[in-house]
Regions:
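Active-site-proximal cap/lid insertion segments
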Residues: 1-170
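Catalytic core of tubulin tyrosine ligase-like
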Residues: 173
Length: 173
């Protein structure tokens, strides 16, 4: 629905020579992760690897006030099982790939509108998820997998392929 609405808007904006602004906020890959079955099927459980730092339980949960009763941590059994972590990772990979396909549809529509060469695009996320790292599933931690989110910028004057490791906050944009 989000990609359809965005594409419809771009179709209208492409007919108008005035600048436009569009903010798109997908729910994915947040819970509930609801990827179509054909995306889930691309990630058979037997091919899903556990994170190298997999633990059945987060060892510092009591010290940081992160009990098993926190919402994200109730999404799977405690202690963590290898199967539950693999299922969560399967769903996460599938919904990310589905999101990528939807973003691709929007970018295709932008290209067809004739506005792609004079449009700035910023892609980011609000946080990552543990999805089995350190015995955690959610975002209630300060590990890099939860705090180091993508930020991609494309547009006139932005050098393709440039990388910058400086910290950024979405409000900086």
């Amino acid at each position: 629905i989000v990609a359809d609405d965005a594409s419809d808007y771009l179709g209208m904006a492409g007919k108008d020579k005035r600048p436009f602004f569009m903010y798109i906020a997908f729910n994915a890959p947040h819970d509930p992760r609801q990827a179509p079955k054909e995306y889930i099927d691309k990630y058979p459980l037997k091919r899903i690897e556990l994170p190298k730092n997999f633990l059945p339980q987060y060892p510092y949960k009591d010290q940081i006030g992160n009990p098993h009763k926190l919402r994200d941590e109730r999404l799977g059994p405690m202690p963590r099982t290898e199967h539950s972590v693999k299922v969560h990772r399967q769903e996460y990979y599938a919904i990310i790939e589905h999101l990528d396909a939807q973003v691709g549809r929007i970018l295709d529509t932008l290209e067809k509108s004739g506005q792609a060469d004079n449009t700035y695009i910023f892609f980011s996320a609000d946080h990552g998820l543990a999805v089995g790292h350190h015995g955690l599933f959610g975002k209630q931690n300060l590990y890099e997998h939860s705090t180091r989110v993508p930020f991609i910028a494309v547009g006139p004057g932005i050098k393709a392929g440039a990388k910058n490791d400086a910290p950024i906050y979405l409000q900086d944009v």
